[in-house]
Amino acid sequence: MRKKEKQKYFMEKLHQIYNDKNLNLTKSCRREILNQYKNLSNNKTNINYASYKLYPHLRDALYDNKDSELLGDFMKIILKYRWKAYFAMILPTRF
């Protein structure tokens, strides 16, 4: 998949999670999902950094919604992209 296709898929999953009435999401989690969705749609951020920002909120939501297949699958995607944000933060620093 190309970059735009990945971003579109990521944003579709965010949209599904945000609008799923069966999920018990906190206000801060919903707010962060909305912020990252807006930033991605305006090209102010990338998938890696959005994954980094969403991870703590969605991890807690997954604990509250253990039976959610949608959230579990999306967490796998988040974990896949999150490590790239860590490398982007660490590599520019001097050792």
Which sequence ranges carry the predicted segments?
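Generic hydrophobic secondary-structure signal
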Residues: 14-17, 32-33, 40-41, 54, ...
